[in-house]
Amino acid sequence: AKRGLLEHNSVVYRDLFDTKLMDCLMPRPGEVVKKFEELYAKSPQEATDYFYKLSQDSNYIRRYRIAKDIRWSVPSAYGDIDISINLSKPEKDPKAIAAAKLAKQSGYPKCLLCKENVGYAGRVNHPARQNHRIIPLTINQTEWGFQYSPYVYYNEHCIVFNFQHNPMKIERATFVKLFDFIKLFPHYFIGSNADLPIVGGSILSHDHFQGGHYTFAMAKAPVIRSFSVKGYEDVT
């Protein structure tokens, strides 16, 4: 800040600046996609391993902040429960909050999930994304994007989002999309938030799912009781 490189010496302005520097070292979006597709032809896991490492090495996923998160498991009557406290999202300082209030509202990108975030320089009320890359996917015959969450709630926490800025909607097609994804990446799980406020996801304005390479305690819980539904006896 003393040299005039930063408007203020705060985490918001430091993030904008170091992301701008990282942009000089990043492979172009098309190069990342090409490398991913080459590795995917050998193994889907090799492709995601490469992409996840790139997302960390580029500082898009800030490992030094993720390390501050607190995670533990506790036993319960229904099995173990995973608990995590996310401490890696940077707190905005008062000067950045004041600047954001005075800043002209651009409306671009429309939200934090839109594909237009790739390469975006950012502003005080929107993170810089010059170090951000996405992988295009075809899901349910429509264009979607695959990326990692910069805050990583669990291992290889990924986000799969519609290329169109459409609102969240749980319907029959939702399950088709989920199954299409795990056919592409059988080593991952994927799920959907509810399309309702409060109990749903934090960005209901943009259709998306969340997945990753992690086994939750719920997946390891023993069966309490089994039953069948008439007409669907083959479903377990």
Give residue ranges: language-model regions.
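Short C-terminal domain-edge/linker segments immediately following a structured domain
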Residues: L112-V118, F179, G191-N193, A221-I224
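Helical scaffold of the NTase/Pol beta-like nucleotidyltransferase catalytic core
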Residues: N131-R133, F163-I190
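Conserved His + Asp/Glu catalytic blocks
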Residues: K169, H187-I190, L196-S202, H213-T236
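Active-site-proximal loop/helix of nucleotide/amide-processing enzymes and allied scaffolds
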Residues: S205
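Hydrophobic side chains in beta-strands
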Residues: I85, Y148, S192, G211-H213
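Short acidic (Asp/Glu) patches
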Residues: A128-Q130, N193-L196
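Active-site microenvironments that recognize anionic phosphate/pyrophosphate groups
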Residues: A1-V160, Q164-P167
